[in-house]
Amino acid sequence: MDKHKDRIESMRLILQVMQLFGLWPWSLKSEEEWTFTGFVKRNYRFLLHLPITFTFIGLMWLEAFISSNLEQAGQVLYMSITEMALVVKILSIWHYRTEAWRLMYELQHAPDYQLHNQEEVDFWRREQRFFKWFFYIYILISLGVVYSGCTGVLFLEGYELPFAYYVPFEWQNERRYWFAYGYDMAGMTLTCISNITLDTLGCYFLFHISLLYRLLGLRLRETKNMKNDTIFGQQLRAIFIMHQRIRSLTLTCQRIVSPYILSQIILSALIICFSGYRLQHVGIRDNPGQFISMLQFVSVMILQIYLPCYYGNEITVYANQLTNEVYHTNWLECRPPIRKLLNAYMEHLKKPVTIRAGNFFAVGLPIFVKTINNAYSFLALLLNVSN
C-alpha cells in the first residue's frame, strides 16, 4: 500500500499550500540546519504574516474601536472577530508545529496503520477522495467570498473598500484608493487561505483518526469467519494493540486541534450575529456584490463551525461502534482464554472516546446546535438594541 498509494492523499496539495503560506514546516531537519536556507525556512512565517496578516487584523480592530456608532462598527466587527479566531489558529499551529508534523508523518508512514487487503485499500481511497474534493469545494467557496466582495465594490459610484479597515492616509480619491484596495485584497487573500487551510488541517486530523476507528471495526468484523482459535487470538491481539495506539493518536490530535476549535466555537456565535446584523444594512439593489458576499460569508461560517463538530462526532460514533463489532465476532465458539481477552477488551471499550475543546466541552453535533442558537439569540438582542 505505502509504495504506490498515499495514506494522506487528500492532504498532499493542502500541505504544500500551507508551506508556501508559512503554516507548515518544510521539514524538521532542514529548519534545524544553521545555514542561510535553514534561517529563511525557520523565519519565513514571520516575514510573511507580521507585515500582512497581523498588521491587517490590527488595522481592522482599530477601525472598529474608532467607529462612531454601532452600525459602522458592525461593518467591520463581523470580519475582525473572524480574524481574531485566525490569530489563535496561527499561533496554535506555530506552537504545535513539531507535534503536528510528527503526527502527520506517523499517519502516513507508521507500519501499524498499513492496509492489509484490497477491500481496505478501496475503502481508504474512497473516503480520502471524498474528503479531498469536499474541501476543495469548501476552499473555492471561501475564496469566492473574498473575491465577490472585492469585485462588487468596483461597480459602485463612490470609493469603498471591500472589507473595512483603518487606512492611515486619505484614500477616497482616484490616486490613493488603489493602494488601500490592493492591501485590503492582499490581506484578505492571505488571511482567507490561512484560515481555510488550517480548518482543513484540523478537520483532516479528526477525519483520519475516525477512519482508523472504522478500520478497526472492519477488522473485527473480518474475524467473524475465523475458525482457527490460534489465528483468531493473534488477530485480536493485533487489533487491541492497534486500538491502544489509535487512542494515543486521539489524545495527540486533541492537544493540537483543541485551541483552534475552542476559539472558533466561542467566537462563532458573535461572528454569525454581526454577519446577520450587517446583512440587515446591506441592500441587494444598492450593493449586490457585497450582499452576495455576505450571504456566502454566513454560509461559510456556519460550515466552519459544523465541520470540526461533525468530524469530532465521527470519532465518538465509530469508537463506540466497536462494542457492537465485538459482539459480531465468533466469540461463542472461542476457547475460555480468548473469551477472557474479549471481556478485557469490552471493559476497555467502556471508556468513551471524545475530542474535548480545552477540557470544557465535547466536540460534536450538540455543541454546533448550541452555537447556532446562541448566535440567533445574540442577533435578536443586537437588533433590539439598535432599534
Curated annotation (Swiss-Prot):
Q: How does it assemble?
A: Interacts with Orco. Complexes exist early in the endomembrane system in olfactory sensory neurons (OSNs), coupling these complexes to the conserved ciliary trafficking pathway.
Question: On the Cytoplasmic side, which residues?
Answer: 1-45, 97-133, 213-255, 312-362
Family per UniProt? Belongs to the insect chemoreceptor superfamily. Heteromeric odorant receptor channel (TC 1.A.69) family. Or2a subfamily.
Kindly state a single biological-process term from the GO annotations of this entry: detection of chemical stimulus involved in sensory perception of smell
Query: A Pfam family this protein belongs to?
Result: 7tm_6
Q: What is the lineage of its organism?
A: Eukaryota, Metazoa, Ecdysozoa, Arthropoda, Hexapoda
Instruction: List the GO cellular component terms.
Output: cation channel complex; dendrite membrane; plasma membrane
The primary location reported for this protein is: membrane
Provide the topology term for how it sits in the membrane: Multi-pass membrane protein
The record makes one more remark, namely: The atypical heteromeric and topological design of the odorant receptors appears to be an insect-specific solution for odor recognition, making the OR/Orco complex an attractive target for the development of highly selective insect repellents to disrupt olfactory-mediated host-seeking behaviors of insect disease vectors. Odor-evoked OR currents are independent of known G-protein-coupled second messenger pathways.
Residues the record marks as carrying a glycan: N384
Report the domain of life of the source organism.
Eukaryota
Transmembrane feature ranges: 46-66, 76-96, 134-154, 192-212, 256-276, 291-311, 363-383
* Cellular location(s): Cell membrane
The identity of this protein, by name, is: Odorant receptor 94a
Topological domain (Extracellular) residues are 67-75, 155-191, 277-290, 384-387
Keyword list, A-Z:
Cell membrane, Glycoprotein, Membrane, Olfaction, Receptor, Sensory transduction, Transducer, Transmembrane, Transmembrane helix
Role according to the record: Odorant receptor which mediates acceptance or avoidance behavior, depending on its substrates. The odorant receptor repertoire encodes a large collection of odor stimuli that vary widely in identity, intensity, and duration. May form a complex with Orco to form odorant-sensing units, providing sensitive and prolonged odorant signaling and calcium permeability.
A molecular function annotated in GO for this UniProt entry is: olfactory receptor activity
